[in-house]
Amino acid sequence: TDPDADKGEFLAEGGGVR
């Protein structure tokens, strides 16, 4: 998915920095 969108959702999983 888009890195920008994941930045918020993946932040909790520590994967926001892609």
From Swiss-Prot:
Domain characteristics, as noted in the entry: A long coiled coil structure formed by 3 polypeptide chains connects the central nodule to the C-terminal domains (distal nodules). The long C-terminal ends of the alpha chains fold back, contributing a fourth strand to the coiled coil structure.
Function comment: Cleaved by the protease thrombin to yield monomers which, together with fibrinogen beta (FGB) and fibrinogen gamma (FGG), polymerize to form an insoluble fibrin matrix. Fibrin has a major function in hemostasis as one of the primary components of blood clots. In addition, functions during the early stages of wound repair to stabilize the lesion and guide cell migration during re-epithelialization. Was originally thought to be essential for platelet aggregation, based on in vitro studies using anticoagulated blood.
Organism domain of life: Eukaryota
Post-translational modification note: Conversion of fibrinogen to fibrin is triggered by thrombin, which cleaves fibrinopeptides A and B from alpha and beta chains, and thus exposes the N-terminal polymerization sites responsible for the formation of the soft clot. The soft clot is converted into the hard clot by factor XIIIA which catalyzes the epsilon-(gamma-glutamyl)lysine cross-linking between gamma chains (stronger) and between alpha chains (weaker) of different monomers.
Keywords: Adaptive immunity, Blood coagulation, Coiled coil, Disulfide bond, Hemostasis, Immunity, Innate immunity, Secreted
Compartment list: Secreted
Protein name per UniProt: Fibrinogen alpha chain
Primary localization: secreted
GO annotation, biological process: adaptive immune response; blood coagulation; innate immune response
Keyword Metal-binding: no
Gene Ontology CC annotations of this record: extracellular region
Record's subunit section: Heterohexamer; disulfide linked. Contains 2 sets of 3 non-identical chains (alpha, beta and gamma). The 2 heterotrimers are in head to head conformation with the N-termini in a small central domain.
